[in-house]
Amino acid sequence: MRKLFYIACMLCVASIASAQEINCTVTINSDQIEGSNKQVYETLKTSIQEYMNSNRWTNMSYAEQEKIECSMLIVVKEAADNMYKCEMTLQSRRPVWGTTYTTPLLNFVDRNFNFTYQEFDRLDWQQNTFTTNLTAMLAYYCYLIIGHDQDSFQRLGGTPFFQACEEIVNTCQSASMESSEQKGWLAFDSNRNRYALINNLLDEAFKKYRNFYYEYHRLGLDEMSGNVTNGRARIAQGLPVLKEAYRSRPATYVIGTFLDAKADELVDIFHKGTDKEKKEVYDLLMDIDATRQTTYDRINN
């Protein structure tokens, strides 16, 4: 487990250094784009991977085996005059204590991953300074990945990284960019975008959810390697927090992103539970996430 650290010392300006935090595999799918220079996508993929994996985003020490494993799939929908309109899926995970299992932390889809890029453009990040929308989005997601990872190891441990995301949102809202690039940063644009997610995560109203997120991982999953029954019971005990948050704000984005990452895992955990656990968990999940009924039905199979 990573050592506890003081929040005031967590962040630093991203710089090229050793002990980087992220190990991200990037895939770019340009199948929908015909008759274009396909080499540009290979160059872009390499540049994004180097940007995410070579920059040091915090002042914490990460051993090689502690790097956060993640993947990014970018599907190019439109490309013209160095403007790319894409959909991006980001997944991150972390190991569960005492097992070979890795648990998903993020399974996030950004449907407005839009940016301007010319082949061989250098991707540089300067904190609190807007350079390009691409570098801003990538930095936002690096901090989002680290924030979720830290929240899973320490109560509210991701706060400074979510605050870094918020700073990027604020910077981008006032930056000059193409209208298609603005999508995702603006409060009125959608209740399911980059702005909405980080606004939820830093909202005092969702502190109970973030405490549950920690307990789910450290006191639930990590406990299950030694005592499956106790770990599962601890997760079941905390799940009503999701229902409470959903009922207070049905349009809450963060609860949806949690279930996007955890729905299958919850099924795997509770289909081996007691009859009481199965019923309570199934009823709760169907109450807040009925669109995934087919998935949750497997709890009772």
Q: What are these model-predicted stretches?
A:
Residues 1-21:
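Bacterial Sec-dependent N-terminal signal peptides
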Residues 20-85, 96-98:
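Start-of-domain marker
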Residues 27, 213-301:
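A cross-kingdom marker for long, charged
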Residues 31-38, 124-132, 247:
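Second-shell loop/turn segments in exported
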Residues 49-57, 147-151, 267, 271:
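Sec-exported extracytoplasmic/periplasmic mature domains
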Residues 82-195:
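Acidic/His-rich structured neighborhood in mature extracellular/periplasmic domains
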Residues 157-251:
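Flexible, glycine-rich surface segments
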